[in-house]
Amino acid sequence: VMVFKGNGHIGIDYVSLLPSTVWGDPDKYRNGKLSPRIVKALKDCHPSFFRFPGGCVVEGDEVFDNQYKWRNTVGPLETRKQIANTWGYMQSYGVGFYEYFCLCEDLNMAPLPVLHVGLLCQIRVGEQRGEGYRRIMPGTREFKAEVIDNVADLLFFAKGDVNSPHAEEAYWANVRAEMGHPAPFALEYVGIGNENWGTEYFENFSACMM
């Protein structure tokens, strides 16, 4: 129960209704928390891999700002920037990529993170609304920052060495370590793009691989 006395305005940014007992080592899960009941249900399925965060939510709709951006999902909860996502509701990032990698490790699942390839949802934007396939063009600074560096930084976060002489690798590896996991995660696969097709996708994908 929350009781407020006096006059004024109160802004509530984040509310969690998780049970008092949560999944996992509290030192490992210092920020985002997982419900033991949901984790048990997942464990009982004996999954061999886990694709996250899903599909169309990665791509964004209308504007690139509502693409799922993994960098906003790590670090302390209070610093995780929420967005209005593709599905039309606020994405809290209460569970982000760090918690995802930890859960895969706990349940012996191979992680399969999905990152955007610089294309807005082709079904919604291109087919349903007839606005064409809107994308970030390869060869631009925006493409490097939003697509290429986005993939590289995730690899640094998951597998990077905290003592690396490469500044970006060391930075993201230390973000991981400060969250409770100094050792690298086991990551072998990355999905770039979701249910995309056509020249626009193949050009963006190829540019990301160069």
Task: List each model region and its residues.
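Non-catalytic accessory regions flanking glycosidase/transglycosidase catalytic cores in CAZymes
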Residues: 1-210
